[in-house]
């Protein structure tokens, strides 16, 4: 029987792979035998993660220092992957930043920086890798969105974040339509709040966990590994007819 979830030997580029959700997804792909290219800005952390994947999973892995807000940095990193592997089958856009401030406490520069990294960075990565996928007539793009592109966080203070993620969702839909003729699927995963380096400051705020328990039917944060299944599904041929979707992994948050 065919294994529809097989991604063994597929080449996967994962941004934000030095920590957080990007690193978790990279490990999930390594466990399935994918060939990995880890992108992030922190070279020392990338080197540590490459060594850990080689030791734990024995799969092929490389890294490239990459700033997703800099298109020249992206094209150089993508060229490095093509030199090593000759193709890119999967792209996961997990790089991002956090900013929990009410509008009146947020500078215009902070707003623009957030939109630049969380939205423009995804656009730049999709454009650079999409060119390769169009030429090879195949590709799987997975953008890390958020449930807060669909529902507003009850505590407020995430206008830049949720606006950027709303843009990511609309970009996902547009690319899904444009690139469907090339056998490229483009989808987004919409996590609720997960335990990562990006969210630790928010989690420690007074009353934060009370909000989580009030609005998330599961009554808790997402845990490491709980995005692995959906990330593998969207990277595999099991999802060949699924494109332009936001799939929320949120403990039931968006069900109410």
PLM feature segments, named:
Residues 126, 164, 172:
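Active-site helix of classical SDR
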């Amino acid at each position: 029987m065919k294994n529809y979830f097989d991604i063994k030997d597929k080449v996967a580029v994962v941004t934000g792979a030095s920590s957080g959700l990007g690193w978790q997804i990279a490990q999930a792909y390594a466990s399935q035998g994918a060939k990995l290219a880890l992108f992030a800005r922190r070279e020392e952390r990338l080197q540590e993660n490459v060594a850990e994947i080689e030791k734990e999973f024995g799969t092929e892995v490389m890294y490239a220092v990459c700033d997703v807000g800099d298109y020249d940095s992206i094209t150089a990193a993508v060229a490095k992957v093509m030199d090593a592997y000759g193709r890119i089958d999967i792209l996961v856009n997990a790089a991002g930043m956090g900013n929990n401030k009410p509008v009146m406490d947020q500078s215009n520069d902070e707003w623009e920086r957030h939109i630049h990294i969380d939205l423009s960075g995804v656009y730049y990565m999709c454009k650079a890798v999409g060119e390769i996928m169009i030429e090879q007539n195949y590709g799987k793009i997975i953008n890390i969105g958020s449930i807060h592109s669909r529902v507003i966080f009850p505590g407020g203070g995430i206008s830049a974040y949720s606006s950027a993620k709303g843009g990511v969702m609309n970009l996902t839909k547009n690319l899904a339509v444009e690139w469907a003729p090339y056998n490229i699927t483009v989808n987004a995963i919409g996590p609720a709040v997960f335990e990562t380096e990006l969210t630790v400051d928010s989690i420690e705020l007074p009353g934060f966990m009370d909000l989580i328990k009030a609005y998330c039917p599961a009554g808790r944060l997402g845990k490491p590994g709980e995005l692995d299944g959906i990330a593998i599904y969207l990277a595999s041929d099991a999802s060949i007819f699924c494109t332009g979707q936001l799939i929320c992994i949120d403990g039931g948050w968006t069900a109410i």
